[in-house]
């Protein structure tokens, strides 16, 4: 099994050096405005020996934030931050995908300046607590 796990494979047109895939995990290491940090570049760069790195859930809009320090990809500052992360992975011959995410009803109004969250239905999320800089609310 280990022997096969470490053999090259391909997903569509994307060749991978092995079959190890790092699943996306919530890291909460972006800046408060969602910009990826040097720590994120280091973290993903350290894991670039996997065949594929799938970076954490990343917000696609400023009105869709469900936890503090959640990374985004909806402005130029975010894009530049992700470029550094991508470069850190590519420098080690790694491949990286970004998990694009809109949390919908899991968005918390405390994290979007009191705005109404945008979701596919008006059904509230039960027990919608969130972590804020001032603790859980």
Model-derived regions: residue spans:
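Flavin-dependent oxidoreductase catalytic cores
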Residues: 1-137
């Amino acid at each position: 099994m280990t022997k096969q796990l470490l053999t090259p494979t391909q997903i569509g047109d994307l060749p991978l050096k092995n079959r190890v895939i790092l699943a996306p995990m919530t890291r909460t290491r972006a800046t408060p405005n969602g910009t990826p940090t040097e720590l994120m570049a280091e973290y993903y760069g350290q894991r670039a020996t996997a065949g594929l790195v799938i970076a954490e859930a990343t917000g696609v809009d400023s009105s869709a934030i469900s936890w503090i320090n959640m990374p985004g990809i909806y402005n130029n500052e975010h894009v530049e931050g992700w470029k550094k992360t991508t470069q850190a992975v590519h420098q080690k011959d790694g491949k990286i995908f970004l998990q694009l995410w809109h949390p919908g009803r899991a968005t918390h109004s405390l994290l979007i300046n009191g705005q109404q969250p945008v979701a596919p239905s008006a059904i509230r999320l039960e027990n919608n607590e969130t972590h804020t800089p001032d603790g859980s609310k």
